Regions:
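Conserved catalytic core of the tyrosine transesterase superfamily
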Residues: 1-202
């Protein structure tokens, strides 16, 4: 389903290329909208241990590993933008950071396009938060522990603070290694009520 969403943006336009990288980043990292629009070019590390640095709730910084497909997509995007480290990673045509409303419109627009080619998409209301849930579900399907998923998504709880004092990038990389790119399909996974409640709290 999410493969259809990633195919929706028109790759012959600047806006379409930006939107695809934005959607892929959100699907893989599970970042909140506020975290995505706060990303700067300098927050992207594409070398060994490729990751994104973001500032989450409570002004706490964390690092999220990048899968190979996301790393290549971001590398290509940055190559055509010729931006400075302090510039927004995802900007308007005038170089200003995208707003929360703009991101929501982008998701709705391409979800509508995807719905025209995917029958299952027509039944769904896709929002930025749904993309965050999708990232969490992919980790769950891959057998990643819920505590690590909460850590990955920057979700604070008594459980996570007791077990982990600092966000461990190596631990997250191991979790990421268990996941598959969006275009690789697998068996359908249905979480139980307890897991659904956990996802709803993220």
């Amino acid at each position: 389903e999410m493969e259809a969403l990633l195919k929706a943006p028109d790759q012959t336009t600047w806006f379409g290329r930006r939107d695809r990288v934005l959607l892929l980043t959100m699907l893989q990292t599970g970042l909140r909208v506020s975290e995505v629009i706060g990303l700067r070019v300098g927050d992207v590390e594409l070398g060994t241990g490729a990751h994104l640095r973001c500032v989450g709730k409570g002004r706490k910084e964390r690092a999220t590993p990048l899968r190979t497909d996301s790393r290549f997509a971001l590398k290509a995007w940055l190559a055509q933008c010729r931006t400075e480290p302090s510039d927004p990673l995802f900007a308007t045509i005038r170089g200003r950071p995208l707003s929360r409303d703009a991101v929501e419109r982008i998701v709705r627009k391409h979800a509508a396009t995807a719905a025209s080619t995917s029958s299952t998409f027509r039944l769904k209301r896709v929002t930025p938060h749904v993309l965050r849930h999708t990232a969490a579900m992919q980790l769950l399907q891959s057998g990643v522990d819920r505590t690590i998923i909460a850590l990955w998504l920057g979700h604070e709880s008594i459980e996570t603070t007791q077990v982990y004092i600092h966000a461990d990038i190596e631990l997250k990389e191991k979790a990421m290694a268990l996941t598959k790119p969006v275009d690789q399909t697998g068996g359908r996974y249905r979480p139980g009520d307890e897991l659904l409640a956990f996802l709803e709290a993220l």
